[in-house]
Swiss-Prot record:
Compartmental location: Membrane
Recorded name of the encoding gene: hflK
Gene3D superfamilies linked: Band 7 domain (3.30.479.30)
Keywords assigned by UniProt, alphabetized: Membrane, Transmembrane, Transmembrane helix
Assembly description: HflC and HflK may interact to form a multimeric complex.
Family label: Belongs to the band 7/mec-2 family. HflK subfamily.
Pfam family, one: Band_7
Membrane topology classification: Single-pass membrane protein
SUPFAM superfamilies reported for this sequence: Band 7/SPFH domain
GO cellular component, one term: membrane
PANTHER family reported for this sequence: MODULATOR OF FTSH PROTEASE HFLK, STOMATIN-LIKE PROTEIN 2, MITOCHONDRIAL
Transmembrane residue ranges: 15-35
Listed name of the protein: Protein HflK
Length: 311
């Protein structure tokens, strides 16, 4: 006969083994984790940093190890004042306080803006401050308030948005490095900037119209400039070239005359009488060849009656 007690003991042993294996499997499975391609995992052992893991399947030791997964390759962003649309700003004075900032000329401007950042050091991001996202938000608001306070409302709306956003980015990165938060601010954007309704908004609209008119006149002036100036420059260059040609011609003629004069002078110095006679003969020949009705009159002749005038 079967020993019931022995069978029970064997069954109990197998059951214990099965339960133990199941528990071990559950514990192992519970401590297996997957790190995504855009993430890194921080593993703490007894509360201290033990290792940092890249993407893949990993296992941690139960009870004594703890893991934190951080998205290090994703650009994250924090938005400010996006509850307000431009129509809300014009129609409602009860705008979101987060979007209202005092400018350097003591006006109030409503701004919709955002900060984009990436995590550079997962451990510093997770453990250097208690609430990193709130800290980043406070740093961003402080930097934006300071930069807005350095500009007038019209500079912010029309001219200097890029300067402000670059200044906020630089200021944030400097403060973040001092606090060792382990992030890099990638970009700061001002999506919308409008004054509240009232006289300031009306003045802003007037300025915008004036700026549009100014740009219109500038473009018209540039168009006329581009049409007229090249033509004038061409005419000026033509006159300059003609003057240069005339100058060269006069210089060359003067040099030629100088060479002729020097040759005559040399001949005269060698044979003055012969040279005088030759010059006289050449001059008379030129006169007689080119003139009509030449009359030769004796200088001692008196009471000369010009026959050519007698009719």
């Amino acid at each position: 006969m079967f020993d019931i007690k022995q069978i029970f003991n064997k069954t109990y042993e197998y059951l214990i083994i099965i339960i133990t294996l199941i528990l071990i499997s559950i514990i192992v499975i519970a401590n297996i984790f997957i790190v995504g391609p855009s993430e890194e995992a921080i593993v703490l052992r007894l509360g201290k940093l033990n290792r940092t893991l890249d993407s893949g399947i990993h296992v941690k030791i139960p009870l004594i190890e703890e893991k934190f997964i951080v998205p290090v390759k994703i650009v994250q962003e924090i938005k400010f004042g996006f509850l307000i649309s431009p129509s809300d700003i014009r129609e409602n004075d009860n705008a979101n306080d987060e979007s209202r900032i005092i400018t350097g000329d003591l006006n109030i401007i409503n701004i919709e803006w955002l900060v984009q950042y990436k995590i550079r050091d997962p451990y510093s991001f997770k453990f250097k401050v208690e609430d990193p996202e709130t800290t980043i938000k406070d740093i961003a608001k402080s930097s934006m308030n300071r930069l807005i306070g350095d500009n007038t409302i019209f500079e912010i709306i029309n001219d200097n948005r890029v300067g402000i956003t670059e200044g906020v980015k630089s200021s944030m990165n400097e403060i973040i490095d001092n606090y060792n938060l382990g992030i890099d601010v990638v970009q700061v954007q001002i999506r919308n900037a409008l004054p509240p309704k009232g006289k300031v908004y009306e003045a802003f609209e007037d300025v915008n119209i004036a700026i549009q008119d100014k740009n219109k006149y500038i473009n018209e002036g540039r168009k006329e400039f581009n049409q007229i100036v090249p033509k004038i420059k061409g005419e000026a260059l033509k006159v300059i070239e003609e003057a240069r040609g005339y100058k060269e011609s006069r210089i060359n003629n003067a040099l030629a005359d100088t060479e002729i004069f020097n040759a005559i002078l040399d001949a005269y110095l060698k044979n003055p009488d012969i040279t005088k006679e030759r010059l006289y003969n050449e001059t008379m020949k030129e006169i007689l060849e080119n003139k009509d009705n030449i009359e030769l009159i004796d200088k001692n002749f008196k009471n000369f009656l010009p026959f050519k005038e007698v009719k």
